Amino acid sequence: MRRQPKYRPERLAALIQETLADALVTELKDPRVGFVTITAVSVTADASHATVRVSVMGSEEEKARSLEGLNSARGFLRTYLAQHLSLRTTPELHFRLDRSLEHARRIDELLAQIKREESGS
């Protein structure tokens, strides 16, 4: 008989997001990790992998540095999750830049430009 998972992937993703956000604020001391916000977490059905989407304020260089810092802290953050969440297995973490906020800002700029051009004609 197969044991049912304790958490659904969506609930587990929310718990991981909350716990990692706490770890970034209180535990992670890497100077490369600047203004990082966890925007989303998705977990595979078997909970073996979690993709963590992050938004980083700053230049492309600062974003790359922050992502590098997060990737080097993956083991520490995974251990932190294991200590704070009662899971059978702790998912492998994969950090990705979330550029949706940048895209939304660019769309807003383009819409504002179109509006200015239409009102100016």
Q: What feature does the model see in each segment?
A:
Residues 1-49, 55-121:
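Charge-rich, low-complexity N-terminal segments
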